Amino acid sequence: MASSLLTSSVMIPTTGSTVVGRSVLPFQSSLHSLRLTHSYKNPALFISCCSSVSKNAATSSTDLKPVVERWPEYIPNKLPDGNYVRVFDTTLRDGEQSPGGSLTPPQKLEIARQLAKLRVDIMEVGFPGSSEEELETIKTIAKTVGNEVDEETGYVPVICAIARCKHRDIEATWEALKYAKRPRILVFTSTSDIHMKYKLKKTQEEVIEMAVSSIRFAKSLGFNDIQFGCEDGGRSDKDFLCKILGEAIKAGVTVVTIGDTVGINMPHEYGELVTYLKANTPGIDDVVVAVHCHNDLGLATANSIAGIRAGARQVEVTINGIGERSGNASLEEVVMALKCRGAYVINGVYTKIDTRQIMATSKMVQEYTGLYVQAHKPIVGANCFVHESGIHQDGILKNRSTYEILSPEDIGIVKSQNSGLVLGKLSGRHAVKDRLKELGYELDDEKLNAVFSLFRDLTKNKKRITDADLKALVTSSDEISLEKLNGANGLKSNGYIPVPQVSSNV
């Protein structure tokens, strides 16, 4: 499966050394300057930020290694400190439930390996009770990724799988996960009135009895790390949640999840729910509280952060936010929000995600699922570090922090100072001058004015001006033919989706 991806080594600067990383990028085969031949499904994924690639990188290692730091001892129901937030990735279970996003067994294994490079604390890799093939795939991940201990850091991911409150599901989950060093089962049931009435057709007491029986059965098989999930917790009665969670804790669970399964909660509402449960559930201080938010109202990231602010210390996310209906909370959004603002506005909370692996992971998931992100998707979209407005371009040229709050290098992208500038009708003279300088042209004011005038005329007919266009403007500025330029070395404006251009040595 890896053969379907283009991998190019890029140099990532770190303190005191150079680390070589893998960038997984889709390109158009027509981009001869890159000397690439593989055709990709969606050329709009082209990212401008990866515009500076070391010539020496091609002969170097292609695996990004995180900063060497010993991983904290793993105790299922305890955290190394009160500010640590465990990242529970469910791309391979909840994410795969995206319509049209199914994965083959080899693809699931490859993504699991990449999630380990990303350093997720827990990866939920599927539903063993759904089919024999799924069980065998999960077993393979448990035997391989679930046993690959990093010798330098001691890191090994927790391998988790989901089960309904049915003994056959729980038995299948044990059969799949028992080979992992750190197996975890997530037993779940619905807790909202509407689900209990119409889906389960059970009373509150019957649901509690079913949950407790399932937890005890999981323990009897050998699980000592058991997570209990409240499906549709966001619409559940608060006092019933306190009661069923209290009984689950008494039965021996290590983690409890409050699911906003239909994405109905507002951030303040969800935060208040977590606060209430932490204050009123017997034994809640002896387990880790997890948040699981869906994105039906576009609030999954905000709700997840609200839950963390209220004291939750496990956040459940997917790569690119894929998942049922409108998707789940996005790993890259939640993690980068905590990295960017956690120390300042959320009492110092943090994760141990190796954020330099985010872009490579995002690209892999997009390619394997066929679920491509829109250009303006936060963190990983093609336009995240791209600027066309002249005012913004001028600021970026002076100091990137004027209009960028995140560093592209932090998510595994290497950019030159000007590589995020897209030249179009909103671009100013300064940006054009700087791009020409990058191309090797030092123009006096008179010549620059002539070129810029032609540039402005050209933008009336083309949405994006290419480097080839700029060169033609310079060399033929006295007798340039706009008609000729419109067909020169670039796509015409009809149907053209503006995406950044990369100039790299691969």
From Swiss-Prot:
The keyword Chloroplast applies. Manganese or any other divalent metal ion, except copper or zinc. Residues 85-359 form the Pyruvate carboxyltransferase domain. GO terms for biological process: carboxylic acid metabolic process; glucosinolate biosynthetic process; response to insect; response to water deprivation. Residues 1-49 form a transit peptide. The modification Phosphoserine is found at residue 98. Optimum temperature is 32 degrees Celsius. Optimum pH is 8.5. InterPro entries: 2-IPM_HCS-like, AIPM/Hcit_synth_CS, Aldolase_TIM, LeuA/HCS_post-cat, PYR_CT. Belongs to the alpha-IPM synthase/homocitrate synthase family. Monomer. The N-terminal part of the protein controls substrate specificity. This is Methylthioalkylmalate synthase 1, chloroplastic. It comes from Arabidopsis thaliana. The gene is MAM1.
